[in-house]
UniProtKB/Swiss-Prot annotation:
Protein name (record): Phosphate import ATP-binding protein PstB
Entry membrane topology: Peripheral membrane protein
Originating species: Chelativorans sp. (strain BNC1)
Coiled-coil stretches noted in the UniProt entry, renumbered to this chain: none
Top-tier EC class: translocase
Keyword terms of this UniProt record: ATP-binding, Cell inner membrane, Cell membrane, Membrane, Nucleotide-binding, Phosphate transport, Translocase, Transport
An individual GO BP term: phosphate ion transmembrane transport
Entry EC no(s): 7.3.2.1
Claim: Nucleotide-binding is one of the keywords in the record: yes
Subcellular location: Cell inner membrane
InterPro entries linked to this entry: AAA+_ATPase (IPR003593), ABC_transporter-like_ATP-bd (IPR003439), ABC_transporter-like_CS (IPR017871), P-loop_NTPase (IPR027417), PstB-like (IPR005670)
Length: 291
């Protein structure tokens, strides 16, 4: 068992054990994640979703419910389909030549793959933060103001200023940049750039925020700040995060879904997934036997 897997095993309750394991796998609780007190309404519903890239099938009959105002983590080894599935939620796979998505994905009950859906509007409602920080080659202010401006969310300069300030505050960045808003966003540190990208997504008032390994390019201090931010944001947004770090999934999520070879193996409350998974593949992945 490598260090990361061992540390994950130390993040939960000592009275609960991974199925079939000895006391070696007993777990104690030290997560920063806020557990859910009660079930939440479903914000995104996926049913029998398949993804093809040309003749190659990358995802097989995936069905899942994503609750609102909670963090759902997608875990699994590289190439398992978790990022492919995440990109289905705001139709980013549409940008890949030869891709095809079948099945049904609903946002608030409406099929997002229906021909009447405005994809630009959809991507405002379901924002995305990528693995590598990608600020626009513009000022800090313009990085955040760009989306609200093109979507017509601000009718006056004062309105735009308020959106920029509020978004940067929600992203935990305002106090660090308020005196240099007109400096290039690319001049910020990596962690600050990622929080700027989160502020940019927030600025257009999304309902859902997708995060594809948002901390993989960050140092531990910047990662901790982003994880704390994720836990704060989930009070107002539905968040889905893809991560290779099971420590991160355990720290920030309320629900976890395990993928392997293009299939959804199982999903459920994060505490249960890490202490009493139903599937052996999940158990083996969490305990470091593969992946």
């Amino acid at each position: 068992m490598n260090n990361e897997h061992a540390e994950v095993m130390e993040m939960h309750m000592p009275t609960e054990k991974i199925v079939g394991q000895t006391d070696l796998y007993s777990i104690k609780s030290s997560t920063v994640r806020t557990p859910d007190a009660m079930p939440r309404p479903i914000r995104v519903k996926a049913r029998e979703v398949n993804v093809f890239y040309g003749s190659k099938q990358a995802l097989f009959d995936v069905s899942i419910d994503v609750p609102e105002r909670a963090v759902t983590a997608f875990i699994g080894p590289s190439g398992c389909g978790k990022s492919t599935f995440l990109r289905c939620f705001n139709r980013m796979n549409d940008t890949i030549e030869g891709s095809k998505v079948t099945g049904r994905i609903e946002l608030d009950g409406a099929d997002i793959y229906d021909g009447s859906i405005d994809v630009v509007e959809l991507r405002a409602r379901i924002g995305m933060v990528f693995q590598k920080p990608n600020p626009f080659p513009k000022s800090i202010y313009e990085n955040v103001a760009y989306g609200p401006r093109i979507h017509g969310l601000a009718s006056a300069k004062g309105d735009l200023d308020r959106i920029v300030e509020t978004s940067l505050q929600k992203a935990g960045l305002w106090n660090e940049v308020k005196d240099r808003l007109h400096e290039p966003g690319t001049g910020l540190s990596g962690g600050q750039q990622q929080r700027l990208c989160i502020a940019r997504a927030i600025a257009v008032s999304p309902e859902v925020i997708l995060m594809d390994e948002p901390c993989s390019a960050l140092d531990p201090i910047a990662t901790a700040k982003v994880e704390e931010l994720i836990d704060e944001l989930r009070e107002n947004y539905t968040i889905v995060i893809v991560t290779h770090s099971m420590q991160q999934a355990a720290r920030v999520s309320q629900r976890t879904a395990m993928f392997h070879l293009g299939y959804l193996v199982e999903e459920g409350p994060t505490d249960k997934m890490f202490t009493n998974p139903e599937e052996k593949r999940t158990q083996d992945y969490i305990t470091g036997r593969f992946g």
